[in-house]
Amino acid sequence: MYVYIYDNFLRAKKYASVVKAMEVNLTDYGIAGKILRLNNYIDAKPIIDDEIKRGAKTIVMVGNDQTFGHILSRAATCECSFGFLPVGPNNSIAEVLGIPVGVDACEVLSRRRKERLDVGWMNNRYFVSQLHVLPAKVEVFYDERFRVTTNDKMEVVVCNLQPFFWKFNKKDTDLRVVHPQDGKLEAFLRPLTKTSWWGYTYEDPSIFPFEEMEIRGEEPFAVEADGKVTKEIKVKIKLAHSKIDM
């Protein structure tokens, strides 16, 4: 049995036609199912667990990158298969997974092809898209061999499934991208140097794959992972291989 979890933004009128067309296609393919609406303030895991008890075998997320991260970061341990129907903008994860945005995604889902996805593990919780440490005075240790420090602040981004787009500065016209790698987490480390009383200048970043990382700060620093922001003094990050059936 299929259960479809719609993100709340799909209630907007501009998405009505594509959502209706997708529902028609799913019925034609014989994989229509129960529809639930996602509230961003509700943990998806107990809802999914309850649907599994009622016989659900496949949970299909309908939305964008934020939908994908919000649900899977909380429900990665659920005993079911997951699917994804991307709708609208902000769907870089769909591109990585090779899923077209909109109605054509229904055909991909109907093929029932399964893969195992890696997820990131951070301080006893999962993240599936990317983790972002906002500029702070931190030091980084990775793969138990290397240490990275700066005199001032450092920005850290760890990519699992979602690419990270960046520029050298505000005047830079070229948009660069950090692509995730299979079997590895991808790190983006960029030091900041203080140039004035209020200002900082970004230095050239370091980009590399890794398996385990620890980020430490003398004071709590902000960490954003799959849309959830927390304050941490130390973050341990590693890859959980083949955690999600999708």
Predicted regions and their residues:
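ATP/NTP phosphate-donor binding region
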Residues: 1-59, 69, 73, 77, ...
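Structural motif
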Residues: 6-9, 64, 131
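Short beta->alpha connector loops
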Residues: 40-42, 64-67, 194-195
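Periplasmic-binding protein-like
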Residues: 57-63, 188
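Phosphate- and divalent-cation-binding pockets in alpha/beta enzyme and binding domains
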Residues: 70-71, 92, 224
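Catalytic core of DAGKc-family lipid kinases
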Residues: 76-174, 179-186, 191-193, 200-202, ...
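ATP/nucleoside-binding phosphotransfer catalytic cores, i.e., glycine-rich phosphate-binding loops
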Residues: 189-246
